[in-house]
């Protein structure tokens, strides 16, 4: 009888642990999106980028580039009313710093 109770308690502890582990796994998590990309889940749109590591000048040379619409960190910077973004690409860390403009 004691063995049966021990196995029952052990099974409950194991089930509780497995449930807590599966709840901790993020659902629907995707890899960060870098554009341009061949990933079909990346929604890449047009953006404006300043290809320089220096501070943005009053009249920067702006060229068309790609960005992610939904899941790029750059997008979280701008509100929905933003007309366009200018991004300064930092070659050291391979990351763009973006600023919003309403022009």
Swiss-Prot record:
<feature type="disulfide bond">
    <location>
        <begin position="68"/>
        <end position="87"/>
    </location>
</feature>
<dbReference type="GO" id="GO:0050832">
    <property type="term" value="P:defense response to fungus"/>
</dbReference>
<protein>
    <recommendedName>
        <fullName>Defensin-like protein 268</fullName>
    </recommendedName>
</protein>
<keyword id="KW-0732">Signal</keyword>
<keyword id="KW-0295">Fungicide</keyword>
<keyword id="KW-0964">Secreted</keyword>
<feature type="disulfide bond">
    <location>
        <begin position="44"/>
        <end position="103"/>
    </location>
</feature>
<feature type="disulfide bond">
    <location>
        <begin position="78"/>
        <end position="100"/>
    </location>
</feature>
<dbReference type="GO" id="GO:0005576">
    <property type="term" value="C:extracellular region"/>
</dbReference>
<keyword id="KW-0611">Plant defense</keyword>
<feature type="signal peptide">
    <location>
        <begin position="1"/>
        <end position="24"/>
    </location>
</feature>
<keyword id="KW-1015">Disulfide bond</keyword>
<comment type="similarity">
    <text>Belongs to the DEFL family.</text>
</comment>
<feature type="disulfide bond">
    <location>
        <begin position="74"/>
        <end position="98"/>
    </location>
</feature>
<dbReference type="GO" id="GO:0031640">
    <property type="term" value="P:killing of cells of another organism"/>
</dbReference>
<keyword id="KW-0929">Antimicrobial</keyword>
């Amino acid at each position: 009888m004691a063995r049966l109770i021990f196995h029952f308690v052990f099974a409950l502890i194991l089930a509780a642990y497995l449930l807590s582990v599966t709840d901790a796994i993020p659902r629907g998590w995707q890899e960060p999106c870098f554009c341009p990309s061949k990933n079909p889940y990346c929604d890449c749109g047009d953006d404006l980028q300043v290809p320089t590591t220096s501070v943005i000048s009053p009249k920067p040379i702006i060229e068309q580039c790609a960005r992610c619409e939904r899941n790029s960190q750059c997008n979280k910077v701008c509100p929905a009313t933003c007309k366009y973004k200018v991004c300064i690409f930092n070659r050291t860390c391979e990351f763009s710093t973006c600023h919003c403009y309403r022009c």
